[in-house]
């Protein structure tokens, strides 16, 4: 099957022991597992893009990472070099949501135009305006990231998206998922054959999905949707969005990609870098060499 884009999941840090209840709603006292932190590289047709950018291990980003036990952090320059890319090569960045581990390295991508849902940005500004007793709503948010995003608008480097948008790049669509993991989360579909009714779609879920259990439950003989364990919005919205994403992936849950799922390595080719981080290779465009073999 021909692919228009090469697709990689790039781990840039991790939490070695994350409670399972963060991955799966209600899974209390069910142990711990590794939680990779990652972003997606899309390369093809003369374009290099990413889905999210990770966080920067300085200031409040570093403080939050240390509070949550994040280890192994590497900057985009180091991580992207493993697939022959530099941050300056990236021309488009699709921000799934504004949590620090997805949006904290905005200033490391000097030539990129950034896409974010208008609701995601405006509601975090609103949340910052609330009195201190509402501060749980800001869990996972670095206020400096919000201000940097506003400044990107001043620089004319921000596209404020209102709902769904097709073909932001050829075969790449943005889909709103309001009031789910965050106020204005979105996910990204790559129709890698370029067809409108694609037989080769990949859905990049951001944090709408943390783990395979969110799409399949724990009983393979009787699958069900189970929400992630952390959300500003509703479990109902997360479940309905899981159904929508699965349909966009042609019913193949393995084509719905959660960057926090360590077990992607069991489904796709991967390797560990010298820094101890994993690259997972989902697809290779024509003429692209494997970065994991």
PLM features per residue range, with description:
Residues 7, 42, 52, 90, ...:
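Divalent metal-coordination and catalytic microenvironments
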Residues 9, 39-43, 162-197:
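Core dinuclear metal-dependent hydrolase active-site scaffold
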Residues 13, 53-56, 98, 120, ...:
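Active-site metal-binding loops of divalent metal-dependent hydrolases
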Residues 14-78, 186-206:
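Conserved beta-strand hairpin/beta-sheet module of binuclear metal-dependent hydrolase folds
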Residues 16-18, 58, 98-103, 182-184, ...:
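Active-site environment of divalent metal-dependent phosphoester hydrolases
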Residues 66-116:
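Active-site metal-binding motif and surrounding structural segment of the metallo-beta-lactamase
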Residues 69-78, 191-293:
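Cap/insert and terminal regions of metallo-dependent hydrolase folds
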Residues 71-85, 89, 119-176, 230-253, ...:
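Metallo-beta-lactamase
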């Amino acid at each position: 099957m021909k692919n228009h884009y090469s697709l990689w999941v790039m781990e840039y840090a991790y939490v070695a022991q994350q409670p399972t209840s963060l991955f799966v709603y209600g899974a209390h006292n069910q142990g711990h597992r590794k939680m990779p932190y990652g972003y997606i590289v899309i390369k093809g047709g003369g374009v290099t893009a990413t889905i999210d950018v990770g966080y920067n291990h300085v200031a409040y980003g570093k403080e939050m990472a240390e509070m949550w036990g994040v280890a192994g952090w590497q900057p985009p320059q180091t991580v992207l070099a493993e697939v022959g890319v530099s941050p300056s090569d990236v021309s488009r960045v699709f921000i799934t949501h504004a949590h620090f581990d997805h949006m904290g390295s905005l200033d490391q991508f000097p030539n990129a135009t950034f896409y974010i849902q208008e609701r995601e940005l405006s509601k975090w500004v609103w949340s910052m305006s609330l009195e201190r007793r509402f501060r749980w709503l800001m869990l996972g948010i670095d206020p400096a990231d919000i201000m940097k995003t506003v400044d990107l608008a001043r620089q004319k480097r921000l596209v404020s998206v209102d709902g769904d948008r097709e073909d932001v790049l050829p075969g790449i669509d943005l889909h709103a998922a309001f009031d789910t993991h965050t106020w204005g989360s979105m996910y990204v579909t790559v129709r890698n054959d370029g067809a409108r009714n694609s037989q080769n779609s990949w859905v990049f879920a951001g944090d709408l999905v943390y783990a395979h259990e969110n799409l399949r439950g724990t009983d393979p003989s009787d699958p069900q949707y189970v929400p992630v364990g952390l959300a500003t919005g509703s479990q109902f919205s997360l479940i309905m969005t899981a159904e929508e994403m699965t349909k966009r992936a042609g019913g193949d849950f393995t084509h719905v990609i959660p960057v926090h799922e360590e077990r992607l390595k069991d489904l796709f080719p991967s390797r560990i870098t010298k820094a101890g981080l994993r690259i997972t290779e989902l697809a290779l465009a024509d003429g692209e060499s494997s970065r994991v073999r």
